[in-house]
Amino acid sequence: MPKDRTRELFIAPGVMMVIERSSSHPIEYAIVLLVERNGTWHTVRAFDNVHDPQEHHEHRYDGAEKQPPIVTHGAVNDAMYAAEAKIRGGWSDIVRSWENAR
């Protein structure tokens, strides 16, 4: 299903969370933490269920390099809520880890 709903939430100056999801079932989503450095937005962490509605991936990035995902299984709404909560509650640590790996 195409992701036809998008929200951009600015968490702090230069830090944004983008939430994309499909309207129809099965729900497909992507939740991405982005940070702006020197005028360019960089993906720091991404959560999605691109392979299966019940299979959820958390991708770390080392610089621009996407790392192998952490994979969990479960309900879409639970996974989306957990991803949003993880970003909202831990974005500064996630960004700091990404910056240290650059």
Regions found by a protein language model. Give the residues of each.
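Negatively charged, low-complexity tracts enriched in Asp/Glu with abundant Ser/Thr
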Residues: M1-N38, H42
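Alpha-helical interaction segments
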Residues: V18-I19, R37, H51, M80-Y81, ...
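Acidic, low-complexity intrinsically disordered segments
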Residues: Y61-R102
